[in-house]
Structure formats: C-alpha cells, structure tokens
C-alpha cells in the first residue's frame, strides 16, 4: 500500500511536521478504505485506527498523529467532494481524464485542493510540496502531481 514512507524519517523532518504528514498519509488511506469498502467516513476512520494507524506511527517514529488535521481534511473532502472532483476534471489536460487516476492519486488531489481552497491554513507551496511527496509514497507520477498542483494553485477557485 505504501512504499517510500521512510523518506519522512525523523532525521529529515521534525516531529511536528511528521505528525501533519502522518495525518495526511492517514487521510489518503481512510478515503481509500471508504471508497473501496463503500463505507462512511466514520467507519473508515475506525477501521484505520484499529488496523493501520499503528503502522503509520511506527514508520514515522511518532507517538500520535495530528488528529485535528486528520479529521478536518477527511471530513472536508467528503463534504466538498463533488465541487473538488469538478475542478479536478475541469483542470486536467485533454489527454488525462479523472477515471484514469488511481483511487489514491485522486484522493491525494482531493485532499490538496481541499487544503488549498477551503481549509487555507497552510500556504499553497507547503501543501504542494507535501502532497507531491505523498504522491511519491503512493507510487504516483510526481511530475504529473507537481505540474497539476502548481497549475491549479495559481487559479482563483471557490469550492
């Protein structure tokens, strides 16, 4: 499910940043569980907490995740899913269609658009860097992710 998670090692990123990264990686997994198992987000959160959270904590050498961020972005993506998906579809190049994206790639884009255009707590450059790194962890095409997120970050989008 996750390949290069060790890149977020404690020697590279401080604990406070790894907690946020862990929350974002966890959000990708929770949204994946919700999509694949066709369950609501609360059920997916519970399944994740019981079965997968300890793996993320161990891999990132953390005691806990940034839970407020995790809940805010997962619930936010669920709430804004349709307008976010519309913006993703609208802004993909002609040779890319939304159904060409893997579930994780799509959810990473959803999370990044939610954080850039709704949540607005972190600056867009930080969000782009974080989600491009997460794209890499989930075997995504980082050139695509970087190009798409950079392009869309320059637009005035209201969700």
Residue ranges and their predicted role:
Residues 1-159:
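N-terminal interaction/assembly modules
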């Amino acid at each position: 499910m996750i390949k290069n998670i060790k890149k977020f090692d404690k020697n590279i990123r401080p604990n406070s940043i790894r907690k946020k990264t862990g929350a974002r990686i966890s959000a990708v997994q929770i949204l994946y569980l919700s999509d694949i198992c066709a369950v609501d987000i609360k059920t997916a959160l519970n399944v994740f907490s019981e079965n997968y959270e300890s793996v993320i904590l161990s891999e990132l050498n953390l005691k806990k995740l940034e839970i407020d961020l995790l809940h805010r972005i997962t619930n936010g993506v669920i709430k804004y899913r349709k307008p976010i998906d519309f913006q993703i579809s609208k802004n993909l190049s002609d040779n890319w269609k939304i159904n060409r994206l893997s579930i994780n790639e799509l959810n990473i884009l959803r999370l990044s658009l939610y954080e850039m255009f709704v949540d607005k707590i972190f600056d867009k450059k930080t969000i782009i860097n974080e989600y491009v790194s997460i794209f890499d962890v989930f075997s995504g095409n980082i050139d695509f992710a970087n190009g798409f997120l950079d392009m869309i970050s320059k637009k005035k989008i209201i969700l």
